[in-house]
Every structure is written in structure tokens, then in C-alpha cells.
């Protein structure tokens, strides 16, 4: 999309498909103006002089598209140009020189005499930084005139009575005043442009219902916009507004207002006038206080004030009884008002990453909530029985707080829950029977707590699919783990486990088993029964050998046994046809690799750093893992297979 003010003759801005703009100076390229920051008069292309010179800048290549100066110049086009500029000694431009004549192709003067070399015109090639190959002027593309195109689009809109006009993503900087003629428009899309301000004539669009101005550079709005008294949706996301423009408060027909990602620091009391709002987004601004006016917006169903600097919410928030989604995450909230309990239609309440130390007991009235998330606060306990009252909850996230025990309320609080996240707290035990009613529980995250043992009824968690117990102080894995036959992901890294029970082999659906950084010395033979296993992580343990049954793990793609005490790898490792990544680095006792490793046809990465492989020549090891694999293949008895 191209822009140009009506009647312009001395300057044209064109936007190419690459997004570069070419603008004219006062004179031609060869005559009146220079391309490379030229000034003065009578200069050539290189910018040693030239009146009204053009200039280049990062991301914006400028060149003339009009004639001027002492002698008109050749025009340039595209991000790379070859400009044949003729610059006689008298300072004349390209148009002042004669073209070559005669069959021999030599240049002649006005008397048809051959011109001596010292007086011949110079051929100058200009290459822009973006190009390695100059482009002849004769192949220049026709400039696109952005301004003219906008004017034409508005004319067509007026003449054909178009009601929906989309000028988005067109690099527009100015909306012409002729927009006033398109009074029939109901939808106007100007998003993703470079508009710094709107013309007052925008107020003539009295039938406008949807106005999308997001992703521009607006710092204000014209007062005339108040005449658009049928406007329902106004999108101002990603602009440069330092305040909510006062005219917005007079657009009382608004139902949806997006102000996300601006520079707004305050919300005026006049907000109370927008009583028809159902959706208000003030996300990602710099707002420190949300006044009582918010309570007047009784029709709100969605309010997003996340990613601001709020420390408190007004009690009046409780008047917004139709709210179904309230997003408060990533603020600096110290408390939540008791009036939050009035929001009985609330389904989603985002309170993540604030400075809360508690939540009000009145939240138990919000029985429509299906998710409870207070991650990243300083909460030590929840009100008694609150979670049990919220019987519709399916997801509970209490991670990164200061909990020392499970919330009070017993098994009833997890009846319909399928996901519980208590990561990064200070909980030292999981109460016996706490999940006895949680028949749908499939995901439990207890990472980074202080667990020393697992409850005796762990065998009843039969529907568990993902269990994360990493970074605790577990010393033993109960035999009853065998009952978790739906388990697909088991993460036990960074604990104090010395062995894995034989019953691990019953977890036939297991895809990921992470035992990194424990004290394990041996693995049970039954590990080979985990036929669905794709990732086995054993690094940083005390393992001296892998069981031969590991060769039965036909779906294994990732095996990490680095930082152990391996003396050898079993020959059966060659049966791992799906293996792609093998880490055996930092095993100080590993002196040789089995030739069978060469049978792993899909192996893409092999790490053997700090392994004293005495049977493989040093120059082969120095060549890297790929060369090692080639050597194994060449010396393998299976090389003909």
C-alpha cells in the first residue's frame, strides 16, 4: 500500500515488496542530488555535491523519482541499482550528454569527433549494502505510490458504497482527509501500519462499528471520534498511548475495548461512563491503581489487567457480577478484596505471580471456577475447605509458594481434579488417602519439595499418567509403583535413590523414565520389559553396568548414561534400532565400545568425551563421534550386514 499527498510533483514515496521506501530529494540522482548524503550543487551520484541531495538510511533506501537541479538525472529503483550517470567536466547532468553513436561504439562530441578518453563521461555503478549484484537502471520496476493507492481505495469505497474497508499491513503513515467521504463504512481495519495520528475527519464515519488501530504509533485520538456514536469495538493494542485518550470515555456505545501493550499509567474516573463494556483489556501497561470506577461496569464479562503494577484492587470490583474471566496475573497485588466472592459467574481467575500471602475465604462462593492458579506468590495456606467448596475445579496450581503441607479439606477437595501442581514448595509428605476420591487424577507435580517417602497407598493412584517427584529427598521407591500401569512419564531425578524395584517392569506404558542424579548402582533386569520406553535418563549415578535386557527397548531414542562408572557397554546395545542420541561421556572406566554399536543405524549423536577408549586409535577419537562410528563399522564383524 502506497502513500502520497494529492498533487505532489517533486516527491514520491514508494514501498517495495521488501519493505524498503524510495524517496526523492530536490534534484535528479545524477545531477541535482547525491545518493550518499550529498549536499551542495552540481554534484554527481557519489554525493560529492548536488543540491537537494537524497540520502540513505538503515532499512529505508531513498532515491529520486522526479527531475530537478541543473540537469535531470536517471532514476534508481530497487534495493540494488546500477546508475549510468554521465558527468561532464562542466558539471552537467546525465540528460546533458549525448549518447554513443557510430558503428564502432565510441563516444562522439557535437561535431561528431571522437571524444578523447579524458573527456569521456564516467560510468558510475552504485551498489547498495544489501546487494552483491548491481541492477541496471533499464530493469527498474515501476514505483508503487502508497499515498495514491490509499486515496484510490477511499474513492472506490465511496463510489461503490463499500462498508468494510481493510487497509491493514500496508505501511501507511497518513490517512488522507478524504476518508470523510466514506460515511457508509461500518468496519475499518488499519492495523499493522505506521500511523502516528488520525485526521479529524475520522469523526465523519458516523456509521462505524468496528475500528481496528492496533499495531501503529498512535499517541492520541482526535476529539471528533466522539461523533462515531455507534462504535462497538475499538482496538488500540500495541500503540504508544501514555493515557487513555479522553475521547474514549465519551464513546458510550463501546462493548469491546482493547488497550493492551501501551504506556498507560492511570485510569480516569470517567471510565464509569462506558457502562456497555463487556470486554476490557488493559494488559501490559504501567497502571498502578484501578479506581472505583471499575465497579460501574456491571456488564463486563472479561477484564484483563494483567502485567501491570497494581498493588490493590478496589472493593467495587465485586459489583462486576457478570465477570466470567478476571486476569490479575503478573502484578504486585498484596491482597484480594473480600468482595471477590460476589463474582459467582467467575470461571477463570488468574492470580499468578503477585505478592499474595493469602486469599479470601469468600472465594468459595465462586463455584463456577474450573481452574485455580496462584503460582508464584507467597501463600502458606488456603482457607479451610475452600478447594472442597469449589467442586468444579479440574486444575489446581499452587506451585512456587510457601506451602509446608497440603491444603486442609481432605480428599473432597480433589474429587474432580485431573491435574495438581505443587512444585517448588516446602511440603514434606503427601497425606495418606488424600487422593482417595481423585479418580480422575492423571497428573501430579511435586517437584522441588522436601519429600522423604511416598505414601503407602501410592498403589491406588491407578489413573496417574504423569508423576514428577524430582528434586526431593526420596530414598526408596515402593514396590506398589507397579500398580500405576497407566503411567507414561515418571521423573525421579535429583533424589537419593539407591535402587529401583523389580516391579518397575510392570509399567508397560512408560515412555519417559528420568533417574538422573541419584545413587543408583544397578538397574533391574526387568527394565527391558518397558517396550514403549523412548527416553531413559541415568546420568550422574554410580552405575557400573547396564543389564543385557536393555536390548529389548526397541522404541528407545534417547539414552543417557554419562557421569557413571561404566566398565563396558553390553553387546545388546546394537539391538536399539530406534536409538538416535547416546550419551556415555565421563565414564572413567569405559575403555572400549562394542562393535555392535555400529548396528544402530539411526544413531545421530554420540558423546564419548572423557572416556579412555584404548582400543580406538587417538586420531579416530580426535575426529569426533561420527568418525568413531565409521571406524566401528569398518572393523565390525557385522560390516557386511
Curated annotation (Swiss-Prot):
Residues 1-19, 96-106 have a biased composition (Low complexity). Residues 1-146 are annotated as: Disordered. Residues 24-56 have a biased composition (Gly residues). One of its GO terms (cellular component) is cytoplasm. LRR repeats lie at residues 161-182, 184-205, 207-228, 230-251, 253-274, 276-297, 299-320, 322-343, 345-367, 368-389, 392-413, 416-437, 440-461, 463-484, 486-507, 509-530, 532-553, 555-576, 578-600, 602-623. Keywords: Leucine-rich repeat, Repeat. SMART domains: LRR_BAC, LRR_SD22, LRR_TYP. It holds the Pfam family LRR_8. The keyword Glycoprotein does not apply. It comes from the Eukaryota. Disulfide bonds: none annotated. Belongs to the SHOC2 family. Acts as a Ras effector and participates in MAPK pathway activation. Probably acts as a regulatory subunit of protein phosphatase that specifically dephosphorylates Raf kinase and stimulate Raf activity at specialized signaling complexes upon Ras activation. This is Leucine-rich repeat protein soc-2 homolog. It comes from Drosophila ananassae (Fruit fly). The lineage of its organism: Eukaryota, Metazoa, Ecdysozoa, Arthropoda, Hexapoda.
Amino acid at each position: 500500500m502506497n502513500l502520497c499527498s494529492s498533487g505532489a510533483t517533486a516527491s514520491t514515496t514508494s514501498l517495495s515488496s521488501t519493505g524498503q521506501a524510495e524517496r526523492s530529494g530536490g534534484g535528479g540522482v545524477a545531477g541535482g542530488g547525491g545518493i550518499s548524503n550529498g549536499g551542495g550543487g552540481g554534484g554527481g551520484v557519489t554525493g560529492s555535491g548536488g543540491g537537494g541531495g537524497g540520502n540513505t538510511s538503515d532499512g529505508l533506501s531513498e532515491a529520486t523519482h522526479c527531475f530537478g537541479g541543473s540537469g535531470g538525472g536517471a532514476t534508481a529503483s530497487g534495493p540494488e541499482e546500477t546508475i549510468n550517470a554521465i558527468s561532464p567536466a562542466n558539471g552537467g547532468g546525465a540528460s546533458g550528454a549525448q549518447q554513443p553513436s557510430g558503428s564502432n561504439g565510441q563516444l562522439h562530441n557535437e561535431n561528431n569527433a571522437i571524444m578523447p578518453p579524458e573527456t569521456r563521461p564516467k560510468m558510475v555503478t552504485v551498489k547498495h549494502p544489501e546487494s552483491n549484484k548491481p541492477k541496471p537502471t533499464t530493469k527498474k520496476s515501476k514505483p508503487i505510490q502508497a499515498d495514491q493507492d490509499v486515496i484510490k481505495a477511499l474513492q472506490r469505497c465511496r463510489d461503490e458504497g463499500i462498508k468494510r474497508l481493510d487497509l491493514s499491513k500496508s505501511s501507511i503513515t497518513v490517512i488522507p482527509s478524504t476518508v470523510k467521504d466514506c460515511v457508509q463504512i461500518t468496519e475499518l481495519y488499519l492495523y499493522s501500519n505506521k500511523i502516528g495520528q488520525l485526521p479529524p475527519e475520522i469523526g465523519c464515519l458516523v456509521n462505524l462499528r468496528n475500528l481496528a488501530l492496533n499495531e501503529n504509533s498512535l499517541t492520541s485520538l482526535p476529539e471528533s471520534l466522539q461523533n462515531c456514536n455507534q462504535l462497538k469495538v475499538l482496538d488500540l493494542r500495541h500503540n504508544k498511548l501514555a493515557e487513555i485518550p479522553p475521547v474514549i470515555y465519551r464513546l458510550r456505545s463501546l462493548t469491546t475495548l482493547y488497550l493492551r501493550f501501551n504506556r498507560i499509567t492511570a485510569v480516569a474516573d470517567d471510565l464509569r461512563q462506558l457502562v456497555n463494556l463487556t470486554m476490557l483489556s488493559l494488559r501490559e501497561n504501567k497502571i498502578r491503581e484501578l479506581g472505583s470506577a471499575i465497579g460501574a461496569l456491571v456488564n463486563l464479562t472479561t477484564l484483563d489487567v494483567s502485567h501491570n503494577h497494581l498493588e490493590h484492587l478496589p472493593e467495587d470490583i465485586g459489583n462486576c457480577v457478570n465477570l466470567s474471566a478476571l486476569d490479575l496475573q503478573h502484578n504486585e497485588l498484596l491482597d484480594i478484596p473480600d468482595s471477590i466472592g460476589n463474582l459467582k459467574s467467575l470461571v477463570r481467575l488468574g492470580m499468578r505471580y503477585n505478592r499474595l500471602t493469602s486469599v479470601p475465604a469468600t472465594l468459595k462462593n465462586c463455584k463456577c471456577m474450573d481452574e485455580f492458579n496462584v503460582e508464584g506468590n507467597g501463600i502458606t495456606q488456603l482457607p479451610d475447605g475452600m478447594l472442597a467448596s469449589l467442586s468444579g475445579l479440574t486444575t489446581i496450581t499452587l506451585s512456587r509458594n510457601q506451602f509446608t503441607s497440603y491444603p486442609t479439606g481432605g480428599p473432597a477437595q480433589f474429587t474432580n481434579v485431573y491435574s495438581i501442581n505443587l512444585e517448588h514448595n516446602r511440603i514434606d509428605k503427601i497425606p495418606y488417602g488424600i487422593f482417595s476420591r481423585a479418580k480422575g487424577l492423571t497428573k501430579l507435580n511435586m517437584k522441588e519439595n522436601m519429600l522423604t517417602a511416598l505414601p503407602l497407598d501410592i498403589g491406588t493412584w491407578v489413573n496417574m499418567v504423569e508423576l514428577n517427584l524430582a528434586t526431593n529427598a526420596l530414598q526408596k521407591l515402593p514396590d506398589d509403583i507397579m500398580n500405576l500401569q497407566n503411567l507414561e512419564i515418571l521423573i525421579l531425578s535429583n533424589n537419593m535413590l539407591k535402587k529401583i524395584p523389580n516391579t518397575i517392569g510392570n509399567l508397560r506404558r512408560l515412555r519417559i523414565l528420568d533417574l538422573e542424579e541419584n545413587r543408583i548402582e544397578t538397574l533391574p533386569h526387568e527394565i527391558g520389559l518397558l517396550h514403549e520406553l523412548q527416553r531413559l535418563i541415568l546420568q550422574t549415578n554410580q552405575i557400573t553396568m547396564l543389564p543385557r535386557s536393555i536390548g529389548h527397548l526397541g522404541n528407545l531414542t534417547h539414552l543417557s548414561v554419562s557421569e557413571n562408572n561404566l566398565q563396558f557397554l553390553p553387546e545388546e546395545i546394537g539391538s536399539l534400532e530406534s536409538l538416535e542420541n547416546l550419551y556415555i561421556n565421563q565414564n572413567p572406566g569405559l575403555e572400549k565400545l562394542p562393535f555392535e554399536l555400529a548396528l544402530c543405524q539411526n544413531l545421530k549423536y554420540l558423546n564419548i568425551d572423557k572416556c579412555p577408549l584404548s582400543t580406538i586409535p587417538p586420531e579416530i577419537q580426535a575426529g569426533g563421534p561420527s568418525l568413531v562410528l565409521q571406524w566401528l563399522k569398518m572393523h565390525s564383524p557385522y560390516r557386511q550386514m
